[in-house]
């Protein structure tokens, strides 16, 4: 069925078609609904690291894009008040004192004083719904700004968490490289002694030097990447470049299996960017209603009452009042109003297509995130096995070398394999963290609107 039904279209928006989408029962084809969903948890429940929690809270408080989004919400809330006030009568008052001096031929100058005080009220009778549609549009823009702010929050939480775990992984990789570099340095010393003692040829010695030099060359690049990542996090947190306090990457902790492959499609209603797109669609529909109403007459009723006299002592002896019925109607504008109405319909169609595209993109993002998460969980397990096997391989190679069964080149190969396995395992743990972040973001986790708040917003 249609994603949602547009309410109260009437004659004004009868050409506004609903989004044409047939939403599947589950996000993953052939999947099933799961009662325990990652999106049901707040971000503070997902990321237990206290340093990361503090960093996220600081980012949500100080990030300039976040502050801009909050200011936009406040702006549109005030603008909605302006538009809503147009539906009610407006009251005004005016007091005045005029004096005119004039002279006819040779006669004495004449002074004409005029004192007045009047109050009035005016009200536009909204026969064709122009003001009501404008109010609906302002409400939609305001609610859309709230959802956009939530989307910004969701994006920032994901961005900070991603950068934090990438930084921790770089720290861990640097530790591995430094430890391996020291191992290769010791290997160079031993290989040189064996070569100079005539126990081996020069080849193992040169090979050990190559391994040491290539490993040492990785250090400056990693140190640079760490500094750049710290600068990125500082920018997200609304600060100047500085060092970032962080924990070590825990390669032993694993995320629990918080979700299965079948996630109910209703969870996509959590996505604030999708909800913002829905509000933009409602605002475009309201613009159609305003353009339709502008093709018809406007009726304004006003009433003015006051007192006026030319002497202050008799000021209250000259009361007056009068009503005014003002009817303004477009007569002949060479099709301008009709063209504006038709243009607003096409603007609505653009928003509708963009909304449909956004829904498709959201389904794709969630499918991609689920695939990435499943793959990352499997890979980190396999990389852990590879690291364990590589460690045992090094131990066995050293034992066999010491007993004369293999050459020193075989030991170097085993140590090189173990080094690569350590790096790959560290990166796979990082990728699992990033995958859970991506899935959490794709599901719109942590930013669902309470039911009571949703009902209030719709009134």
Predicted regions and their residues:
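Sec/SRP-type N-terminal targeting helices
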Residues: 67-68, 84-85, 125-153, 203, ...
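Periplasmic alpha-helical coiled-coil/stalk elements that build and connect Gram-negative outer-membrane
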Residues: 131, 140, 147-263, 372, ...
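Terminal intrinsically disordered/low-complexity segments used for targeting and assembly
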Residues: 1-61, 139, 223-269, 442-459
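Short flexible linkers and secondary-structure junctions
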Residues: 10-161, 298-303, 324, 334-341, ...
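Short sequence motifs at beta-strands and strand-loop junctions characteristic
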Residues: 109-113, 317-319, 420
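Short segments within alpha-helical structural elements
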Residues: 185, 213-242, 376, 384-443
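Outer-membrane beta-barrel pore domains and translocons
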Residues: 94-100, 122-124, 170, 211, ...
């Amino acid at each position: 069925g249609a994603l949602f039904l547009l309410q109260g279209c009437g004659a004004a928006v009868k050409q506004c078609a609903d989004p044409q989408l047939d939403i599947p029962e589950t996000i993953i084809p052939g999947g099933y609904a799961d009662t325990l969903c990652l999106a049901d948890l707040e971000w503070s429940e997902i990321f237990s690291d206290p340093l990361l929690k503090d960093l996220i809270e600081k980012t949500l408080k100080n990030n300039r894009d976040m502050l801009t989004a909050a200011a936009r919400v406040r702006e549109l809330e005030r603008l909605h008040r302006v538009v809503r006030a147009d539906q009610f009568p407006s009251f005004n008052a005016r007091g005045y004192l005029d004096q005119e001096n004039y002279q006819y031929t040779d006669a004495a100058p004449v002074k004409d004083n005029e004192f007045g005080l009047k109050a009035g009220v005016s009200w536009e009778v909204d026969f064709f719904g122009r003001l009501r549609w404008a109010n609906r549009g302002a409400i939609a823009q305001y609610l859309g700004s709230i959802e956009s702010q939530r989307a910004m929050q969701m994006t920032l939480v994901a961005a900070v968490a991603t950068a934090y775990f990438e930084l921790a992984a770089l720290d861990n990789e640097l530790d591995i490289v430094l430890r391996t570099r020291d191992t290769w340095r010791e290997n160079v010393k031993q290989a040189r002694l064996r070569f100079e003692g005539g126990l081996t040829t020069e080849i193992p010695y040169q090979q050990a030097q190559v391994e040491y030099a290539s490993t040492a060359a990785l250090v400056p690049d990693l140190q640079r990447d760490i500094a750049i990542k710290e600068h990125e996090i500082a920018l997200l947190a609304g600060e100047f470049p500085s060092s970032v306090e962080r924990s070590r990457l825990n390669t032993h902790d694993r995320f629990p299996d918080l979700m299965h492959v079948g996630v109910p499609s209703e969870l996509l209603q959590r996505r604030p960017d999708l909800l913002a797109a829905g509000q933009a669609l409602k605002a475009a529909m309201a613009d159609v209603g305003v353009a339709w109403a502008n093709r018809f007459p406007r009726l304004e009723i006003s009433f003015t009452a006051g007192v006026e006299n030319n002497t202050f002592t008799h000021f209250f002896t000259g009361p007056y009042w009068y009503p005014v019925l003002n009817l303004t109607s477009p007569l002949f504008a060479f099709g301008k109003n009709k063209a504006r109405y038709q243009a607003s319909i096409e603007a609505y169609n653009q928003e509708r297509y963009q909304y449909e595209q956004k829904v498709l993109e959201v389904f794709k993002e969630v499918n991609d995130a689920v695939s990435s998460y499943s793959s990352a969980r499997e890979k980190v397990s396999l990389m852990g096995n590879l690291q364990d096997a590589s460690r045992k391989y090094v131990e066995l190679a050293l034992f066999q070398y010491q007993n004369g069964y293999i050459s020193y080149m075989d030991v170097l190969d085993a140590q090189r394999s173990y080094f690569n396995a350590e790096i790959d395992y560290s990166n796979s743990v990082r990728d699992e963290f990033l995958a859970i972040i991506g899935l959490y973001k794709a599901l719109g986790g942590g930013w669902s609107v309470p039911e009571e708040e949703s009902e209030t917003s719709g009134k």
